[in-house]
Structures are given as structure tokens and as C-alpha cells.
Design a protein with these regions (language model features):
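Selective transmembrane helix interface/packing segments
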Residues: 2-275
């Protein structure tokens, strides 16, 4: 039987006593779905996200302080994406999707650092685990997010270029036929391009692992190092390591979003004059 309780916080930064496991502790099952501690965190983040969306939908002509902060954040994301894409109009199209991902990741990466969140523990078979495990320290979360991103990119690519136009980047049969019609040499060259296109399919699938493992590996490694370092230097290090944790959480969010922005811009239909 799982028992939920709280522990008193001695520092502004929550310090765990045990090194976290790669697999999140399981709380139970709802039908075929397994509910883990990271699932609770994800649901809590979703609730925060809904509150933010409601707040934005009720924005006023004369912004209050919170609305002003959200507008500053939007402008920062817009400028960041425009610097990657190199086209302000394209950036405006990408901002809503990528901005939502960045907001989610920043909340997910920084939420476990708040002392109130870290004060809730659950006892499973005599062992104590944090009730709110960092969502991005669970590979299931990062894999699901990366898979959703890659699938969305395929849908956008088909929407922008058409089914056959988009698939022609991967299965270049027409290029092979055209190549052999021109000459044998160009035909052989087009065959090479055909196999390169097939490799691109593998590349698209690899993006799922690349995005998910990068985010999971960095955030999980940071959590493990937090336990080790704060366990050894629990007096002097917490404030310094909290700053490092904030930096790691924000940087990993930016890296993930930058890669998604690049993937998004690649599947958009090229406009006249773009190369």
C-alpha cells in the first residue's frame, strides 16, 4: 500500500537522500495505463499549463504585471526562432507550437526544484520516493514528447508539400526514371540519391531517439549529480547548485526547442527566393 507524506525542508533547495532510479516508481494502474510518480508530475504541469492558457485568453488591453511577463517571454521566443529560421514570417508561424513546447519544458525542468514540490514523499514497500518526480528525468516522458514532435513534423510536411511531394524526398523513384532517360551516368547517380532518400527515413526515425535521449540523459544526470554533491556538501553547495540547476533546466529547454525549430523549418514549403 502506498503512503503519501511530507518531509520538512531544511534548505531552499530540496535535497534527496537516495540516488534516483532510471525507472520511475509505479503508484498503480488505471486499466492498461501505468501511473508512475512522473505521471503525477506531468498531470500537475498540464494543470499549470491550462491555468496559463486561461490567463492568456483573458488578456487585457492594458496588461498587468503577469501579462507583461508573458508578452516579454513571447517576444523572446519569437526573436529566438526568427534568428534560427532567418525569416520573421516563418517565425510567426512556428512560434505557437514551439513556444508551447518551450513553456512546457521550462516548467517541467524547473518544477522539481521548488521546495514545496519536493516535500511530498510516497512510501512503496518500505522505500521512500518523491511523489513528484521530474517529468523529463523519465525516459517515457521525453520519448513521448519527441515522438509527438516527429509525427507532427511529418503531418506538417504533408500539409505543406502534399503527400507525393513530401514522400518524394524519401522515395525518389521519379528521379531515377528521369536520370536514366537522360543518360546512363545520371541514372546511376540518381540511384545513389534513391538510397540516400531511404537513409533519410532512418534519419527521421532516429530523431525520436536523438531528441528524447539528449533531454532525458542531461536531466537525469543532473538529478543524480544533485544527490551526490548535495549529499557530500549539504551546507555550502545548495545555493550554488540551485543556480546551476536553473541554468541546466533552461539550457536543455532551449536546445530541444532549437532542434524542433530546425526540423519544423525544414518541412515547410520553400517560398520563392528561398534556398
Amino acid at each position: 500500500m502506498a503512503d503519501i507524506h511530507t518531509v520538512e525542508q531544511s534548505t531552499v533547495l530540496h535535497v534527496r537522500e537516495e540516488i534516483p532510479t532510471i525507472i520511475s516508481p509505479t503508484l498503480g494502474n488505471v486499466g492498461p495505463l501505468t501511473i508512475a510518480t512522473s505521471t503525477i508530475t506531468t498531470m500537475f504541469i498540464t494543470l499549470i499549463f491550462i491555468i496559463l492558457c486561461i490567463s492568456v485568453s483573458r488578456s487585457k488591453l492594458i496588461p498587468n504585471k503577469f501579462q507583461h511577463l508573458l508578452e516579454i517571454f513571447y517576444e523572446m521566443v519569437d526573436s529566438f526562432i526568427a534568428s534560427i529560421v532567418g525569416n520573421k514570417e516563418r517565425a510567426k508561424e512556428i512560434v505557437p507550437y514551439v513556444g508551447a513546447i518551450m513553456t512546457y519544458l521550462i516548467i517541467a525542468n524547473l518544477l522539481p526544484m521548488f521546495p514545496l514540490i519536493g516535500s511530498f514523499y510516497i512510501t512503496i514497500d518500505g522505500e521512500h520516493f518523491p511523489l513528484f518526480r521530474g517529468a523529463t528525468t523519465d525516459f517515457n516522458t521525453t520519448f513521448g514528447l519527441a515522438l509527438a514532435v516527429v509525427v507532427t513534423m511529418q503531418v506538417i510536411g504533408i500539409r505543406e508539400q502534399g503527400v507525393f511531394g513530401y514522400l518524394s524526398h524519401f522515395i525518389q523513384i521519379k528521379q531515377v526514371i528521369k536520370g536514366f532517360k537522360k543518360s546512363f551516368g545520371e541514372g546511376m547517380t540518381s540511384i545513389v540519391g534513391f538510397f540516400v532518400g531511404l537513409i533519410e527515413i532512418v534519419s527521421e526515425l532516429a530523431k525520436v531517439l536523438s531528441l528524447s535521449l539528449r533531454l532525458f540523459g542531461n536531466m537525469f544526470a543532473h538529478e543524480v549529480l544533485t544527490v551526490i554533491l548535495l549529499g557530500a556538501f549539504s551546507v555550502a553547495v545548495p545555493a550554488i547548485w540551485m543556480g546551476m540547476g536553473l541554468l541546466v533546466g533552461v539550457v536543455q529547454s532551449i536546445v530541444f526547442v532549437a532542434l524542433v525549430t530546425v526540423y519544423y523549418s525544414l518541412v515547410l514549403k520553400k517560398e520563392h527566393g528561398e534556398h
